[in-house]
């Protein structure tokens, strides 16, 4: 069914597009849910088309231009406001009993209306070797009491002095695309800066280039300049798994592999650092939506509601290591719940998740912030780089009339 298109759909057929290319664990879950829905609704058929993630957003934009969007589609949380603003998506009419039970970071609101919901979310954390912390005499921070900046800096210095490791920490700068804004903007926000004025969504001036933002950029650059972190770590977090570094900043989806490698007791799952304005991590992951052009909106919405049942949220979690977006599903999962291996990842997300700003301009903000941070790590002047980033973001907002609803 991967080559089926919207054009050939028969009556009673709903088309569904997903970023989970065929053969992946997530695809298998979606297929199971679709088959169950088809069985429960004779006369209705969900027809799945799967895309590789890399080209998925482009496929949606192209289909929208040709008026060939599917009935049901998944989307990465931060892109939703742009697609809602562009008229691709229908508002979702879901029962309050469902939406009230969901974590906030899995609900996609734009201009006060709900457009997408996600079966899961995940979180960021520091993973560290317990033995290294013991050798360096470092106290372990807790979710209730995360590191301060001074404590974190002191811990990095001590870890860097251990003879067994090349660097103190892998900050995962090998990763690309949405990773840099997702992973490092929360640190900027903890310093007191931001990537845009969240209240008005009309400017980045004073937020991305104020004194707090400059302090963040200077500190971030120093990690690499002072030799605490590598500018060229191995891809995919291999430095930590190979014992080259005692700590890595990573997504919750990296925890199981680390526990398999070193044993669960040796792997500390640590919260983000409180740089002054509270600890923060990125929130929001893949979510489901209905296209505005769908002639089967009601059935499409029913499918999304069907997919959000606890049993399926458990299935998603067990397949891909994310946590369910509804608390009642958590005890049924392999990895989440009291005493289970990924429980701290959920607690960190619940305590500290900050959504990326819900503006149609986020796509541009994301790429501008990504470039600015890369330049800063490479040694560019922090203030000048951030001033230029603000100019670029504000110019885009102006060029789109402030992204007001059309």
Question: Which stretches of residues belong to each language-model region?
Answer:
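Conserved N-terminal structural module of periplasmic/extracytoplasmic solute-binding proteins
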Residues: 1-81, 88, 275-277, 298-299, ...
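Extracytoplasmic/periplasmic substrate-binding proteins
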Residues: 19, 38, 80, 182-186, ...
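Periplasmic-binding protein-like
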Residues: 29, 130, 305-327
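Short helix-initiation/N-cap motifs at beta->coil->alpha
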Residues: 50-59, 78, 146-151, 230-242
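Hinge/lid segment of periplasmic solute-binding proteins
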Residues: 75-125, 180-183, 187, 268-270, ...
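Extracytoplasmic/periplasmic solute-binding protein
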Residues: 110, 115-119, 124, 150-204, ...
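Glycine-centered hinge/linker elements that transmit conformational signals in sensory
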Residues: 153-158, 198-231
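Long, aromatic- and glycine/proline-rich binding clefts that accommodate carbohydrate-like moieties
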Residues: 318-371, 402-406
């Amino acid at each position: 069914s991967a080559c089926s298109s919207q054009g050939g759909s028969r009556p009673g057929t709903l088309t569904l597009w997903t970023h989970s290319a065929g053969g992946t664990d997530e695809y298998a879950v979606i297929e199971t849910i679709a088959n169950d829905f088809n069985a429960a609704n004779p006369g209705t058929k969900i027809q799945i088309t799967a895309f590789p993630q890399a080209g998925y957003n482009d496929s949606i934009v192209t289909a929208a231009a040709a008026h060939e969007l599917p009935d049901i589609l998944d989307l990465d949380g931060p892109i939703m406001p742009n697609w809602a603003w562009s008229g691709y998506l229908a508002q979702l009419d879901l029962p309050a009993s469902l939406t009230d039970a969901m974590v906030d970071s899995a609900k996609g609101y734009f201009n006060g209306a709900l457009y997408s919901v996600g079966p899961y979310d995940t979180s960021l954390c520091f993973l560290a070797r317990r033995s290294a912390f013991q050798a360096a005499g470092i106290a372990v921070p807790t979710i209730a009491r995360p590191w301060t900046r001074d404590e974190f800096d002191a811990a990095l210095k001590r870890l860097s002095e251990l003879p067994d490791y090349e660097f103190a920490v892998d900050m995962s700068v090998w990763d690309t695309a949405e990773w840099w804004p997702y992973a490092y903007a929360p640190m900027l926000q903890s310093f007191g800066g931001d990537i845009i004025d969240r209240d008005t969504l009309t400017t980045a001036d004073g937020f991305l280039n104020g004194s707090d933002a400059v302090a963040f950029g200077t500190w971030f650059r120093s990690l690499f300049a002072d030799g605490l972190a590598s500018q060229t770590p191995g891809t995919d977090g291999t430095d930590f798994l190979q014992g080259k570094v005692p700590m890595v900043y990573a997504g919750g989806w990296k925890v199981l592999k680390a526990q398999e490698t070193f044993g669960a007791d040796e792997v500390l799952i640590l919260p983000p650092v409180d740089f002054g304005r509270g600890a923060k991590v990125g929130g929001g992951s893949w979510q489901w939506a209905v296209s505005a052009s769908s002639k089967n909106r009601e059935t499409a919405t029913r499918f999304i509601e069907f997919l959000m049942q606890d049993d399926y949220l458990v299935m998603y979690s067990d397949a891909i290591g994310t946590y369910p977006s509804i608390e009642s599903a958590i005890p049924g999962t392999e990895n989440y719940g009291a005493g289970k291996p990924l429980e701290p990842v959920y607690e960190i997300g619940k305590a500290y998740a900050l959504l990326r700003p819900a503006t149609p301009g986020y796509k541009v903000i994301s790429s501008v912030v990504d470039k600015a941070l890369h330049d800063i790590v490479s040694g560019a002047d922090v203030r000048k780089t951030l001033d230029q980033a603000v100019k670029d973001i504000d110019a885009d907002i102006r060029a789109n009339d402030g992204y007001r609803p059309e």
